[in-house]
Amino acid sequence: MKYVVKLGGAALENPEIFMACARAVADLVKDGHQVALVHGGGVQLTRTLKQLGKQSEFIAGLRVTDAETRDAALMVLSGRVNKSLVAALGSLGQAAMGLSGGDGLIFRARKKRTVPDLGFVGEIVASDPRWLEAIWKMNAVPVISSIALGFDGEYYNVNADEMAAACAAACRADALVFLTDVPGVRGADGTIMRWLTVDQIPVLSQTEVISGGMLPKLGACREALLNGVKRVRILPAEAAHVLPDLCSARVTDGTEVMAS
């Protein structure tokens, strides 16, 4: 089977959870699956920007990205975070290749048109998964940072959830899994929803049951399902160990998002 796993949030900060996620990915490959690992790094980027004396601003869960912030994102996401994940997989004996979405023209972006303007924030408009296929043939894991190249030659910061959905659609993944720092999607009563359909997402958004970073995440879930991805699940990163059992056993952690 073909998996796209998105890792972000505090999972990248906690050494134990970080390694548990890497181990789960390595176990999937050991079991014969093809895995692409897409990552964010918003916490690390915010910290670096603060060290540079720059405040972070978010609108509807998306980071406002001027040229300086974009350059910092290139450094942090495609550099420090990406190579840390490659190293973690390598320490487990699993070969990995670190990439940005712009490498090999795997993903092409255009500036996201929003009001107010978000700056160098992009959305994926084209993809070419041949590099991913080549890496999989070597029994390795492509590790992809959420940076993509525009047709104008500029790099764009892409929401990592949206990047993961685009990756899953491009390679026709059997499953897209978001490993995150929340236990799942909370309903109006505050309890974790074990499943929801794409038709429920606009309603939950309009009633403000979901907000902040969960908005683009659920939007990404919807796009993935509408573009042929078979399964989408939001899973707490501390439950990453269930990944190898996701399609062969009953898993109750997190929230399953379904097409209908």
From Swiss-Prot:
Pathway: Amino-acid biosynthesis; L-arginine biosynthesis; N(2)-acetyl-L-ornithine from L-glutamate: step 2/4
Residues engaged in binding substrate: G41, G42, R63, N157
Molecular-function GO term, any one: acetylglutamate kinase activity
UniProt site positions, description: Transition state stabilizer: K6, K217
Subcellular location, record wording: Cytoplasm
SUPFAM superfamilies: Carbamate kinase-like
GO cellular component, one term: cytoplasm
Sorted UniProt keywords: Amino-acid biosynthesis, Arginine biosynthesis, ATP-binding, Cytoplasm, Kinase, Nucleotide-binding, Transferase
GO biological process per UniProt: arginine biosynthetic process via ornithine; L-arginine biosynthetic process
Reaction catalysed by this enzyme: N-acetyl-L-glutamate + ATP = N-acetyl-L-glutamyl 5-phosphate + ADP
EC number: 2.7.2.8
Superkingdom of origin: Bacteria
Family: Belongs to the acetylglutamate kinase family. ArgB subfamily.
Function: Catalyzes the ATP-dependent phosphorylation of N-acetyl-L-glutamate.
Protein name: Acetylglutamate kinase
Lineage, uppermost ranks: Bacteria, Pseudomonadati, Acidobacteriota, Terriglobia, Terriglobales
Gene: argB
